[in-house]
Amino acid sequence: MKKHDNIYAKALNKVDDFKFDESVVDVFPDMIQRSVPGYETIVHTIGELAKSSVTPNSMVYDLGCSLGAASLSVSRAVSANTCEIIGVDASSAMVERCRRVVQTFTLPNPISIEQGLAQDVDINNASMVVMNFTLQFIPPSDREGLLASIYKGLNPGGILVLSEKVKHPTRSGNELLIDLHHQFKRDNGYSELEVSQKRAALEKVMLTDTFNEHETRLKKVGFADVVMWYKCYNFTSMVAIKA
């Protein structure tokens, strides 16, 4: 049974920067479902994309794997013994919990979970790389280099699935999307206090780009095409394809 997210339910004297610590890990499944519109659709579709993209004897990397939802989706969607999946997360608490989650299943394709920064992962022989709401937490100065490393490590025809919270290029449009997202959270039981304190906690650690900035950067490092396949409010998922 999912634990209820009430991390920001009481007024805090000081709202610290958001981090994926033990308190967040404990409530993460509830938090992500109530905060990200279409999260289940995104995770399911990552598996669907894997069916047509993951090739025999290749690697799949899930960078910023959290509790392994995307890794599990890929493992179950692809024919048995097709690939090896490596999930990587910077949070020690998340890695420890993710390993426990993964070990509870008998999986068609093996998943190993490692602790580390996405920027430090050596991508090789990859048919698919997933970053599901990860790049937005990586320092902007590191983003292009990370994407270049992913592109280099992907086999021809390989894909990067990149899901991100994005900002709209106009101020009024961006505020509209933020308002819609905040209402989505209220509809899912978060109070005004929770919404405002969570926003303050994320302000300095989650730095978003526009879709055009993502597309330009992905094409700059070599990707032949970038397809936005999902968007709701200021949340999107895209597929970058290596020719």
Swiss-Prot record:
EC number: 2.1.3.-
GO molecular function: carboxyl- or carbamoyltransferase activity; S-adenosyl-L-methionine binding
Complexes and interactors: Homodimer.
Pfam families, sorted: Methyltransf_25
Sequence positions that bind S-adenosyl-L-methionine: 39, 64-66, 132, 199
Family membership noted in the UniProt record: Belongs to the class I-like SAM-binding methyltransferase superfamily. Cx-SAM synthase family.
HAMAP family on file: Cx_SAM_synthase (MF_01589)
Organism: Alteromonas mediterranea (strain DSM 17117 / CIP 110805 / LMG 28347 / Deep ecotype)
SUPFAM superfamilies in alphabetical order: S-adenosyl-L-methionine-dependent methyltransferases
Role description: Catalyzes the conversion of S-adenosyl-L-methionine (SAM) to carboxy-S-adenosyl-L-methionine (Cx-SAM).
Name listed for the protein in its UniProt record: Carboxy-S-adenosyl-L-methionine synthase
GO biological process: tRNA wobble uridine modification
UniProtKB keywords: S-adenosyl-L-methionine, Transferase
NCBIfam families noted in UniProt: carboxy-S-adenosyl-L-methionine synthase CmoA, PRK15451.1
InterPro entries listed in its UniProt record: CmoA, Methyltransf_25, SAM-dependent_MTases_sf
Gene3D superfamilies: Vaccinia Virus protein VP39 (3.40.50.150)
Reaction(s) catalysed (UniProt annotation): prephenate + S-adenosyl-L-methionine = carboxy-S-adenosyl-L-methionine + 3-phenylpyruvate + H2O
